[in-house]
Amino acid sequence: MEFRVIIPARFDSTRLPGKALVDIAGKPMIQHVYESAIKSGAEEVVIATDDKRIRQVAEDFGAVVCMTSSDHQSGTERIAEAAVALGFEDDEIIVCLQGDEPLIPPDAIRKLAEDLDEHDNVKVASLCTPITEVDELFNPHSTKVVLNRRNYALYFSHAPIPWGRDTFSDKENLQLNGSHYRHVGIYAYRVGFLEEYLSWDACPAEKMEALEQLRILWHGGRIHMVVAKSKCPPGVDTEEDLERVRAYF
């Protein structure tokens, strides 16, 4: 099975400006993400960006870079432009790996591509990991996902879902029962689907939650979720996240 990885990266992050280039253990964050993608066994790894500073740094450490428009609302829109520019075929599998996931395990990247390859009727797959800590469940920077019995996503939110009507009133004594999952910022797409995604308007829930994947559910699409067998550390959204990742390295 062959697959490619595209890493969308922008400089003007709202919560942590310039985070793609912040130093982590002597390397810019985007390089750590790139190296994880290389280790996954991908046929090709490309960084898609609209920023010349990111392009220069990426090319300096040997990455292939595709320059894109600065008008995109999401990473999915950015990689869709890159996939067309690079001439990828409709049936090829592209993994969209966000540029703020420096701790993503390489085997998780490959597993996601394999999951999409094994499900011929699925156009989008993504990754989640069980939530084991109450603080993470109630952290608004952590995206939660609710699954159906076949591991398709029902909804994504920054809110703690599913809501425990009878248990959440006492957070100090709350015991999680394995029914809560954190969404990990990585997707696998069939290239042909990306063109379909671009034809859809952003939906109200997507705008309210600032979660691009809700556009897929709103328009009747399905996202098959792979539940990670090993812990996938959260990405970098805030200064606190950055210090946590630096401590890890």
Curated annotation (Swiss-Prot):
Chief location category: cytoplasm
Gene Ontology terms: cellular component: cytosol
Pfam family of the protein (one): CTP_transf_3
EC nos: 2.7.7.38
Annotated pathway: Nucleotide-sugar biosynthesis; CMP-3-deoxy-D-manno-octulosonate biosynthesis; CMP-3-deoxy-D-manno-octulosonate from 3-deoxy-D-manno-octulosonate and CTP: step 1/1; Bacterial outer membrane biogenesis; lipopolysaccharide biosynthesis
Entry's localization field: Cytoplasm
Keyword list, A-Z: Cytoplasm, Lipopolysaccharide biosynthesis, Nucleotidyltransferase, Transferase
Protein name: 3-deoxy-manno-octulosonate cytidylyltransferase
Record gene name: kdsB
